[in-house]
């Protein structure tokens, strides 16, 4: 397990009956670019049970945050959804991914489009000051089934005060656009 750090759960937030997020400690050696993902999991017996998760916290924060859906029979999420403060998880020492600002050319508008927990990598991107140096306007479209699934709404509107948050709610044919 030398490729993994053991981290402690600091907090857990249940957004709905199907969505939750949690924060953990962060080993000082863990580096990532905003928008990347890493493998996280739990020790189950002698083997780690791992899945890829986008990092929702920004790379300058001293904690890690992850956003997840609750899958009742999911091998990992059925366990993660019961995390509590003080529990331990394992986090890969390496992050990866191409959904990073470095891979984009500067431009006028940056459109970030995600559904459900696909919002997670964009949470770190909109916290990145470089995003606003390279793009005049940031537009975030978050699609979900129900209004209550619009997780992180307050943080998003604080981060995008002059930019746009658009939500599309499929189960109720409801949408919101904030100029």
Model-derived regions, located:
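FNR/FR-type flavoprotein reductase catalytic core
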Residues: 75-179
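Ferredoxin-reductase
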Residues: 2-85
